[in-house]
């Protein structure tokens, strides 16, 4: 009889260790911002919109585009709020050029510019609307 009791105690000990080693996630608050994948479609659309609005409002002769998304978060409200921290870089494309995808970044030190920008974009996907509700940038 000692053998089944030992087996049961061993099994309970293993389960206790496994439970203790499992990472705990705190309770998620409904509607709170959560981390988002920078490659997900909604984030990409929000980023494209933010970069477009950034370039429209810029007095620079050259377009800028995202070098990398440093952090992406989203919040489900009546639509979706996206909070994007983005490293931006100045490209060689002037404002008269429209396709930013193929624009290389300036590599000449006197023309090279980088900025770290935080964008907040409100999107209502089922209506196809976006608005840039807040943004700030600082030189990097």
UniProtKB/Swiss-Prot annotation:
It is found in: Secreted. One of its GO terms (cellular component) is collagen-containing extracellular matrix. One of its GO terms (molecular function) is protease binding. It comes from the Eukaryota. The record marks 31 as: Reactive site. Its main location: secreted. GO terms for biological process: cellular response to hydrogen peroxide; embryo implantation; eye development; positive regulation of cell population proliferation; positive regulation of DNA replication; response to axon injury; response to carbohydrate; response to estradiol. PROSITE patterns: CYSTATIN (PS00287). Disulfide bonds join 93-103, 117-137. It holds the Pfam family Cystatin. SUPFAM superfamilies: Cystatin/monellin (SSF54403). Keywords: Disulfide bond, Protease inhibitor, Secreted, Signal, Thiol protease inhibitor. A motif (Secondary area of contact) lies at residues 75-79. Residues 1-20 form the signal peptide. SMART domains: CY. Belongs to the cystatin family. As an inhibitor of cysteine proteinases, this protein is thought to serve an important physiological role as a local regulator of this enzyme activity. This is Cystatin-C. The gene is Cst3.
């Amino acid at each position: 009889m000692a053998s089944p009791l030992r087996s049961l105690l061993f099994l309970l000990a293993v389960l206790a260790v496994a439970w203790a080693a499992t990472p705990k996630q705190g309770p998620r608050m409904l509607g709170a911002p959560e981390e988002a994948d920078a490659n997900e479609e909604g984030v990409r659309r929000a980023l494209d919109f933010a970069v477009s609005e950034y370039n429209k409002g810029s007095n620079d002769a050259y377009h800028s585009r995202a070098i990398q998304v440093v952090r992406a978060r989203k919040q489900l409200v009546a639509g979706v709020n996206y909070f994007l921290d983005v490293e931006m870089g100045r490209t060689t494309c002037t404002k008269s050029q429209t396709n930013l995808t193929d624009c290389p970044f300036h590599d000449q030190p006197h023309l090279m510019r980088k900025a770290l920008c935080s964008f907040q974009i409100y999107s209502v996907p089922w209506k196809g609307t976006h608005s840039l509700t807040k943004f700030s940038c600082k030189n990097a």
